[in-house]
Amino acid sequence: MSMSPSRLVLASNNAGKLAELQALFASLGVALVAQSTLNIPEADEPFHTFVENALAKARHASLHSGLPAIADDAGLCVDAFAGLPGVQTAFYCTQFGYPKSDDNNRKALLEQMVGVTQRRAALVSTLVAVRSAQDPEPLIATGRAVGEITTELLGDKGFGFDPVMWIPSMGKTFAQMPEDEKNALSHRGQAAKAMLALMQSRWFS
């Protein structure tokens, strides 16, 4: 059955992620509401894959809000580290004794990459949307942006690993790109574009 939700709960308290997805979903006429504004606690993320964690977060947000929900699980997969940190990206720096933060994640990554010549990496995003906590047919979209880890921070836009993710085809990092340019190329932008198409055909038709 098709539906046209006017509000969609975002299962994240990350302000950068909320702003980015709000811009990407504006064309649907749907208001994205951060789960924190509804006093919804963060869900557990016990799984080893992005899709399982995103689904768990979406179901959790929908269960506690009674609204359709969307969740993003994203991370950095570094070739030289056999695909890690992966689903543990947000906590990457904590294994090296740093408090959890974007700044410390970037600092720890650059420190661990000193002397590493294989700098290829991918930022991966998986978006999952559910109509209800029991939705048997969640919408799933993925995006992947491949680049190279820089040796220093470049650019002051964006968030997360944007200042260290060099995109060779553009000759700059995500943090050096205007928002519209980044959204067209980024992992989250790719996933959001695919999710928009799914929603338009399945929920809004």
Segments predicted by a language model, with ranges:
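Anionic-ligand binding patches
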Residues: 3-9, 15-33, 37-205
